[in-house]
Amino acid sequence: MSSPSPGKRRMDTDVVKLIESKHEVTILGGLNEFVVKFYGPQGTPYEGGVWKVRVDLPDKYPFKSPSIGFMNKIFHPNIDEASGTVCLDVINQTWTALYDLTNIFESFLPQLLAYPNPIDPLNGDAAAMYLHRPEEYKQKIKEYIQKYATEEALKEQEEGTGDSSSESSMSDFSEDEAQDMEL
């Protein structure tokens, strides 16, 4: 049996690092496809919200950026409301192999939520509201959090979709078990 490629080793290392950084990670099909529970950054209108963010790592990771998307609805100029697709220049255009998965959840996404770019929106309604009616924009975010982004809402969504038994939450694994996965 041959040893894993450098790209595969890097993928495994980055996923384990994300798990060890205390993010709740649910593996879907393999270490290249998983969901991370993401909490709204403090001091932003998104504070108090909780979202599931799907991450798909391409075969050429880390030289090609991961695909990320919100699984439950979020109201934001740079996130498509229907698909959850994130318009994030750092990830989509300027990603380099120097970045890792923790950068996405500890820097890129919090910055995007704190500082939307209404000039290049995926959600035109959110962009217009952000620019012209900021108080209404903040209220709409709060409404979305109450409806779609609470722990209770996530549980209801999981029950409604019938979570697959093949999913395993990495937060349930011991550190030794998580380290074994990178071998």
UniProtKB/Swiss-Prot annotation:
This protein's GO CC annotations = cytosol; nucleus
Q: Mind listing the UniProt keywords for this protein, alphabetically?
A: Acetylation, ATP-binding, Nucleotide-binding, Transferase, Ubl conjugation, Ubl conjugation pathway
Modification N6-acetyllysine occurs at = 60
Query: Which intervals carry biased composition (Low complexity)?
Result: 163-172
- Which Gene Ontology BP annotations are present? proteasome-mediated ubiquitin-dependent protein catabolic process; protein K11-linked ubiquitination; protein K48-linked ubiquitination; protein polyubiquitination; ubiquitin-dependent protein catabolic process
The EC number(s) this enzyme carries: 2.3.2.23, 2.3.2.24
**What positions constitute the catalytic site?**
87
Q: Name one GO molecular function term.
A: ubiquitin conjugating enzyme activity
Q: In which pathway does it act?
A: Protein modification; protein ubiquitination
Can you summarize the PTM annotation of this record?
Autoubiquitinated in vitro in the presence of NEDD4L.
Please name the SMART domains in this protein's record.
UBCc
> Ranges for the UBC core domain?
1-150
The portions of this protein that span the membrane are none
Superkingdom classification of source: Eukaryota
Subunit architecture: Interacts with MAEA and WDR26, components of the CTLH complex that contains GID4, RANBP9 and/or RANBP10, MKLN1, MAEA, RMND5A (or alternatively its paralog RMND5B), GID8, ARMC8, WDR26 and YPEL5.
What is this protein called in UniProt?
A: Ubiquitin-conjugating enzyme E2 H
Q: Which organism is it from?
A: Homo sapiens
- Organismal lineage: Eukaryota, Metazoa, Chordata, Craniata, Vertebrata
User: What gene is behind this protein?
Assistant: UBE2H
